[in-house]
Each structure stands twice: as C-alpha cells, then as structure tokens.
UniProtKB/Swiss-Prot annotation:
Residues bound to Mg(2+) 2: 121
Pfam families: Pyrophosphatase
Family the entry assigns: Belongs to the PPase family.
EC number: 3.6.1.1
Gene3D superfamilies the UniProt entry points to: Inorganic pyrophosphatase
Species assigned in the record: Kluyveromyces lactis (strain ATCC 8585 / CBS 2359 / DSM 70799 / NBRC 1267 / NRRL Y-1140 / WM37) (Yeast)
Residues that, per the record, bind Mg(2+) 1: 116, 121, 153
Regions annotated as coiled coil: none
Cofactors demanded by this protein: Mg(2+)
Superkingdom per UniProt: Eukaryota
Quaternary context: Homodimer.
Gene for this chain: IPP1
Name used for this protein in its record: Inorganic pyrophosphatase
C-alpha cells in the first residue's frame, strides 16, 4: 500500500500542514491508516511526525478533520525542542501508530497513571533519517513508560523492516547487543529534554527499564482497543477529538467528501528558524 504526502504552507510556520494521501486522496493520519501492515507477521504502520535530529515539535492534530501533521504551539508560538548536549533535536525518528489512543480515562495498573490522550508514540531507531508524513512499516522491539506530568506516555521502540539491522533485532535485548548505548541515551534524552524550558526532569515507570516485545504488543493491543471505543463514539472524549475518516464506512464520522475539503498542495520555502534554537544546553547530572 503506497502513501504520499500533501504539504500545505511553509515549514516552521503556523500555516504548515502535512496530510497523508492514499491513491492521491487525503486520508486521516489518525484513523484511516491501518495499525497493522501485516498482522500475521507482526508488522505495523508508523506515521513519522518528526525526523531524527530536527527540532520542530510536529504532531498529528486531534482537532482538525483528517488529522494533518502540524507544528505544536504554546501561547500562539511555535514549539521547538531544545538541544541537550550531546544531542541535536530529537534523538530518533519520532511518530505514532495510527488507530491507537492512550485513554485519559483509564489508569494503567502498573504505571498507576492515565493515558495522555494521544496516539501511541513510536521511536524508529533505524539508520535512515525519515521525513514528516512518511508511513513506515516497522517491527516492535520494546517499550518505555514515560510519566509525563502525571500521565502515562508510552514510547514504543521499533525499527523499519527494511533497515539492514532489522533481521538481527527481534526483541529488546537485541537492541543493546547490536546498538550498545542506544537505550541508555534514549532514557537520558527523555528525562532531560524539557529542562531547558524550565520544566522538571521527566520520570519513568519501571525505573526506566525498557519492557520486552511481548509486553509491548499487549500495550499496543490495549491502545488499539481504546481507539476502537473512541472511533465508535463510545468514549466520553469522542466529541473532543475529530474522528472524521474516509475509510470506516460503519462509523458515524465517515465522510466520503472530507478529502475534497482539503486545500491543494502548496509547498512554500521553509520559514527561517530563530538562531536561538541552535543553542546547546548542558544539563547537570546527564551522562
């Protein structure tokens, strides 16, 4: 299945949007792309939001029809992740699993915290730098449980099935064997990345341990079931999230016409990023 992107507006601007297309028609990045690319073989679709080594905080929006990828804002200003030495921007290709949702009404029995009201986050650790809106086929290896301001924010660790290392990586212990230091660096980055913005260090459940593949698959199934409840309108949050879709004809929010309302592609030159975003921050206590 081939997916393409439709960019509207200039990157690093409030108008920037990236829609996912299938057969040239916009679809929902949240609801229309199947979670499984090949369920029998454990292969998942991942929507890339943020390429590795970049700073713009891009995310699938929950508030607009067909859920394009936009840059997050705070008090009307675009948000960027700061550079925490020795890292530059995001440490991995960062994205989400479609057709998943971390339910803010349900407390996880082990983390003791509710979901963060977003699709399930994915960290793709392969060698290629991805692009915003890319739909990658990945296999999952493990998961970390970030506790972000009182919410469970799972971070699934996965690798592109076409990566040269993919055949050797089948569970979380293989990551340390073939990519020594990656899990430690990932843990450190998520602990400290908000400190330059004046926020406290993030905490992890399980003392920062990355859980194995079997545990991860259970988390994914739970989040897929939560999404099914959401898209069917049975969740209390169904009215707060845009559920418009173009493929799920048995849902009340199905719309065959939604794609025609999406603006035509309008790729403009990138807006400049303020030079202050280049600054390196040295965090006391980080490795």
């Amino acid at each position: 299945m081939s997916y393409t992107t439709r960019q509207v507006g200039a990157k690093n601007s409030l108008d920037y949007k990236v829609y996912i297309e299938k057969d040239g028609k916009p679809i929902s990045a949240f609801h229309d792309i199947p979670l499984y690319a090949d369920e029998a073989n454990g292969i998942f679709n991942m929507v890339v939001e943020i390429p590795r080594w970049t700073n713009a905080k891009l995310e699938i929006t929950k508030e607009e029809p067909l859920n394009p990828i936009i840059q997050d804002t705070k008090k009307g200003k675009l948000r960027f992740v700061r550079n925490c030495f020795p890292h530059h921007g995001y440490i991995h290709n960062y994205g989400a699993f479609p057709q998943t949702w971390e339910d803010p009404n349900e407390s996880h029995p082990e983390t003791k915290a509710v979901g963060d009201n977003d699709p399930l986050d994915v960290l793709e650790i392969g060698e290629q730098v991805a692009y915003t809106g890319q739909v990658k086929q990945v296999k999952v290896l493990g998961v970390m449980a970030l506790l972000d301001e009182g919410e469970t924010d799972w971070k699934v660790i996965a690798i592109d099935i076409n990566d040269p290392l993919a055949p050797k990586l089948n569970d979380i212990e293989d990551v340390e064997k073939h990519l020594p230091g990656l899990l430690r660096a990932t843990n450190e980055w998520f602990r400290i990345y908000k400190i330059p913005d004046g926020k406290p260090e993030n905490q992890f459940a399980f003392s920062g341990e990355a859980k194995n593949k079997k545990y991860t698959l259970d988390v994914i199934r739970e989040c897929n079931e939560a999404w099914k409840k959401l898209i069917s309108g049975k969740s209390a949050d169904a009215k707060k999230i845009d559920l418009t879709n173009t493929t799920l004809s048995d849902t009340a929010t199905y719309s065959a016409e939604a794609a025609s309302a999406v603006p035509a592609a309008n790729v403009l030159p990138d807006e400049p990023i303020d030079k202050s975003i280049d600054k390196w921050f040295f965090i006391s206590g980080s490795a």
